[in-house]
Amino acid sequence: MLLPLACLHGRVAQCLTSLLLLAEPLPRPRRGARARGAASTGAEAAPAAPPAKMAAELYAPASAAAADLANSNAGAAVGRKAGPRSPPSAPAPAPPPPAPAPPTLGNNHQESPGWRCCRPTLRERNALMFNNELMADVHFVVGPPGATRTVPAHKYVLAVGSSVFYAMFYGDLAEVKSEIHIPDVEPAAFLILLKYMYSDEIDLEADTVLATLYAAKKYIVPALAKACVNFLETSLEAKNACVLLSQSRLFEEPELTQRCWEVIDAQAEMALRSEGFCEIDRQTLEIIVTREALNTKEAVVFEAVLNWAEAECKRQGLPITPRNKRHVLGRALYLVRIPTMTLEEFANGAAQSDILTLEETHSIFLWYTATNKPRLDFPLTKRKGLAPQRCHRFQSSAYRSNQWRYRGRCDSIQFAVDRRVFIAGLGLYGSSSGKAEYSVKIELKRLGVVLAQNLTKFMSDGSSNTFPVWFEHPVQVEQDTFYTASAVLDGSELSYFGQEGMTEVQCGKVAFQFQCSSDSTNGTGVQGGQIPELIFYA
């Protein structure tokens, strides 16, 4: 699968670089520590170095000096035995000092003779050889023309860690050249690959992780590839999910593909309106647009498709016209379920977009209004979307004794999950004395930071049922971290309340854990109170 990887890797990886830099990355080392290791990770944009010298050349001056000294001593001894010493000749002029070594990329430096003593373990000594000219027997010229870097390496180390390198150096068709060109791998990614092979250290960054995954796949280093996938999963969110979906398909990573679909389905509107959506390839576009589980309105899908078409026209150097948009979209336009929009959505959106022909627009209007509906080339059935799930944390509810009162105070509870979910809203109790309208503010926080909130109203019918209050968009919640759900209600003072609360609740494949929140000032806790339900997608 190397050919399709190389074809699409460049453009999509460039887009994801900017998107991942916006997401929260894994903890980074301090800048000072980074600076010390920048050369070995390829982070510096060092100027192209002249052809690297082998170890024998590096040590030649010292060896020559030692030989001269030995010869002069031997000559002096012979002279003393043979007879009277001849007058000393004029001293030879001192040789000019050697020119300073040009800057190189990485760990290219001479080590003191005792470097082995300072590194007692095999791992430490082996790590020292990473990107080091000492004993290097092969050099790689990495990167595209005009942006190459020369990297020294040791065939044995690479062959032990990669079957591809083994075949390259020791197989039947082994390379005999001492310099090997690799134009399709980024220098920084190649250095990360080699650093892992020399030292087992994995140093991933948001701006190089995709290129590193490509290199790990190319040279069949599965542990590094797995680390890259794990890094991408932790960085996965709505704004980069579509790009990562495209990459996961190219790299044949089914687990990452599934994680991408979970985000895209649950947060479809945010994913489709992201900049990353406009950078995917057309095949991925078609796969997304045909997705049955997209949890958004069809008008949002249509708008996203038009945005992608405009971006594709720019990439191909075409004028942005309705004709060219139809051309770059191809069959993708006819995968949008336009007839499932409301008549108002169609009239104010797709009908005025100019991308549909007059005949198509006329036929769709007739389909909305006429008894005898015309045949359309667009799908007619609504998407199924996602069915929300509810985690109910109380075993019973009450209202007669110890009446619960909403007094504009905060009811709050903390929760954690054992896998990623998307909180869509909260289920709340209503009035215990008949129909009533409530004003409510719901909020979701993590470590004191507000992730989502909504100020709205809901009607209760006097029953003990819970009433859903939704966030504007589902909120991504990660595993093994406590979040705080809060609600502040104003309205009828008397309401139902929950009893016999549970600290742990299993909802399908998701386990919820609850604990009291210090934000709660109206009496809600684990054992009783309000916020009986969390509404989520998984």
Curated annotation (Swiss-Prot):
It holds the Pfam family BTB. GO terms for biological process: neurogenesis. Keywords: Cytoplasm, Signal. Residues 29-53, 76-115 are annotated as: Disordered. InterPro entries: BACK, BTB/POZ_dom, BTB_POZ_BTBD6, PHR, PHR_sf, SKP1/BTB/POZ_sf. Residues 35-53 have a biased composition (Low complexity). The keyword tRNA-binding does not apply. Residues 136-206 form the BTB domain. This is BTB/POZ domain-containing protein 6. It comes from Homo sapiens (Human).
